């Protein structure tokens, strides 16, 4: 399946303007997707070279980074201002800088769970999964009721192919969910972790809470709801797959395409259609959203196929 425009008889019900930071109300990544990531974009520093050989760049400082840096300089022992700067840097794809900023905060606040969560989150984007796992484990020890810490710990474990542990973390995160949005998000990753662990019956049971009356509040979670209905057999792959993004500035379209393509690709792996899955994963990694979970997951699957 190519990334060229195709007609699939399916449209998004709504669009949402994404905020600047990842954690404000949901697990949205769209706020952190740059409009360009190659040399043609007027990029900042090189962040990483992916395992597939692609150079992934930061974006230059914007007003948010400049202001946050000034605020921290005025009060360098403020955890709140450390987090403000780290999030502003991450929004400009400055992940290495964000990790360094969080580390600076941990030097004077070594028992702050939010700082461990923030650093672990950014390490995931840098593909530093083991350091991320250690930081996120520490966050859960310091704040046992922090849903975001378990959620991101589950991602670290999942990307390390520790699927049983990932399922346990997502199950714990889901138990802490206080909204349908969190229930939907955690259920998706719990399901895929259990399927990758070979626990098909448990995975099916994990979807039992996703009944027709479970509706998303944040409109960007609509594609997760559709994925869950696909897993339940209520929608076909053709119906659930969104069109490719309209262009490099179509951030919401990119996130939706990557997330659903990765989910459907995973489904095809479960059903022994690896060649079809690989086609979807290759489409994802052609895109711009190199920090989205669907992009990272697709990248890892392609790398595993080369082993």
Predicted regions and their residues:
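N-terminal leader/linker segments that initiate helical-solenoid repeat arrays
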Residues: 32-80, 84
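Structural marker of alpha-solenoid helical repeat scaffolds
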Residues: 74, 108, 142, 176-179, ...
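Helix-start (N-cap) detector for alpha-helical repeat units in TPR-like alpha-solenoids
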Residues: 79-80, 113-114, 147-148, 181-184, ...
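Residue-level recognition of tetratricopeptide repeat
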Residues: 87, 121, 155, 192-194, ...
